[in-house]
């Protein structure tokens, strides 16, 4: 089941997106959680070289200070190319299990895109 209720605005931190998931509708017993997956749909881009490679990284936000600075930990990463189209899948089971046990710790995910550098 999906428990995404809303997508709040964007916080700037490099070139990324900060997204929150309302998980209060999910069962609070994390021991019954088998797996949790975040899926992002990628459309091909025509503004860059189609063969360009990128890594999409999902970070769990641990804290946000008064100036918008974030302490984060990497949860999952997927490599893709600029010409790829389809769903990128990220295993976020550990983060969701933690949030189910301590909902106040749910500060969302921060998603970043990193180009691969050519030698």
Question: Model-found features: residue ranges?
Answer:
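Short coil-to-beta strand junction motifs in C2/discoidin
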Residues: 33-34, 48-59
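Beta-strand elements of modular eukaryotic interaction domains
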Residues: 8-11, 27-31, 44-49, 77-80, ...
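Cysteine-clustered segments with highest specificity for TGF-beta superfamily mature ligands
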Residues: 17, 40, 64-119
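Generic detector of short, locally flexible boundary/turn motifs and exposed helical patches
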Residues: 2-4, 21, 53-57, 72-77
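Generic hydrophobic, helix-prone segments enriched in Leu/Val/Ile
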Residues: 1, 58, 96-99
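A short beta-strand-loop element at or near the start of a globular domain
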Residues: 1-42
């Amino acid at each position: 089941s999906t428990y995404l209720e809303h997508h709040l605005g964007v916080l700037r931190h490099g070139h990324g997106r900060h997204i929150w998931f309302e998980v209060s509708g999910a069962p609070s017993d994390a021991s019954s959680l088998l797996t949790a997956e975040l899926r992002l749909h990628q459309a091909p881009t025509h503004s860059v070289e189609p063969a360009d490679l990128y890594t999409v990284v999902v970070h769990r936000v641990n804290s946000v200070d008064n100036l918008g600075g974030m302490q984060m930990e990497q949860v999952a990463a997927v490599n893709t190319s600029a010409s790829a189209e389809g769903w990128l899948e990220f295993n976020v089971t550990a983060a969701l299990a933690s949030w189910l046990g301590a909902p106040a710790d749910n500060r969302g995910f921060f998603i970043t895109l990193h180009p691969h550098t050519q030698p």
